[in-house]
Amino acid sequence: MYSSVYLLLSIVFVGGSNAHDWDSFESHHSEPRLRTSNLDVGEYCATFHENYVYYCRGIWTAEKLLEHRSIMKKIGKFCPSYKSACVTRTRIDPEEERERKEDHKKELTDDVGDMAFDDLMRKLEKIVPCRPNCNVSVHPHCTRQCKCEYEYHRMQKWCKPPRIEERFKYFCRIWYMSCSTYIEELDPEMADAFVSQYANYGNYHG
């Protein structure tokens, strides 16, 4: 439910004690004016509550039907709109809502309990990507291998051309040594050069 309700009302609520003031307006004008208002949900519900009680919940006698026949189309639109915004929304039992949330949580945990470890890790990767700054003590799936896989395609744009540009060598060297699984993709001479210079650089993944 949005925090505000935007209403284009073809029925004007005339501030009085009687909800059927709608009809007093109808009797003096050939066409109803359009009133545009931007109301908070609570303001909308409070303002038009009397109209809802009178038109949507009151008993419709033959006399009442005859009296308001000219605005029946408007009433037909107003009643479900008000009910959706103000009545159905507020009838949620707090206890039922709590139980619903607990049941939903149980369904999620049951699903996780039935998953294999690798499947669970893959599911977690979709929720929290294995970026280099992902803390493995907080997110256990953020292992070095997971971080390497996450960065792999991006790093290949810079680190696997026929010749690596000088400005990228520092980062490529650190990445390949931190993600040694992929170092065999380099040609032997480049791999040897990276290994021989590794001691002078830090660890990409900390």
Curated annotation (Swiss-Prot):
One of its GO terms (molecular function) is Notch binding. Coiled coil: none annotated. GO terms for cellular component: extracellular space. InterPro entries: Notch_signaling_modulators. One of its GO terms (biological process) is positive regulation of Notch signaling pathway. This is Delta and osm-11 homolog protein 1. It comes from Caenorhabditis elegans. The lineage of its organism: Eukaryota, Metazoa, Ecdysozoa, Nematoda, Chromadorea.
